[in-house]
Amino acid sequence: MALMTLSVAKEKRPLVALLGLMVASLATLPLLPPIAQDPSYHQFADQRTLLGIPNFWNVVSNLPFVLVGTVGLWQFGRDRARFVLFLGVFMTGFGSAYYHWNPNNGTLFWDRLPMALTFMAILTVAVEERVSAKAGAILLWPLLALAVFSLLLWRWTDDLRLYGWVQFFPCIALPLLFVAFPARYSGTSYWLIAAALYALAKLFEFYDHAIYSVGHILSGHTLKHFAAASACFAILRYFQTRRPVSRSPSLACDSH
């Protein structure tokens, strides 16, 4: 019995460390200078109007989010965390299209809100997949509330520090989760593909104008949408194809 208790305590240590990192990183935010929204953020490279749609490519390139979100909701909508995840992806398509139709801080709120919910849902789902469904269920609602509050705080104070945490903390936490906890399901490669595609999306976003200047065909921001939606598709494929990973008898005994 003592050995089993010690084993369970050992398994919980990485999760406790992750929660500690979460609290510590949040506690450091007030020590950082406020981050205001850059007014030039809305000046995207490709502002062409086509078929009566302003900023055409930045608007219509959100369609893949809607498609991935629709399939995800259809197949996995009965699971709470995955429902939030794919609803967030689905609504990101509409929120981002709404924003790019008329880019300003007011419409940007509706672009960022579903994205913030998606970031926190991805973190929750990863905890469910690598740690336990119970741990994920405990984290889901507090993290979603934090996501919503981060956007409200930005609107009230023009301070993006907390929203920045919501967006980038999963980038730190997910690798730690995947290293600290063994896979309970197959398909880890899909998570790696999703991470690579998201990194590519951020790169496209940064080089928006530079990419558009080469031929004036598509801008970096449009390509960012395609890459980010592809990352969401990789996560969808993970859930479509994953299978439980068999564990050795000794490990199975240790986990009970």
Language-model segment annotations:
Residues 2-139, 149-152, 156-159, 185-247:
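Early transmembrane hairpin module of multi-pass membrane proteins
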Residues 62-70, 144, 167-174:
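Core segments of transmembrane alpha-helices
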Residues 152-185:
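Active-site rim beta-loop-alpha module in soluble metabolic enzymes
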Residues 246-256:
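Short, highly charged, low-complexity non-transmembrane loops/tails of multi-pass membrane proteins
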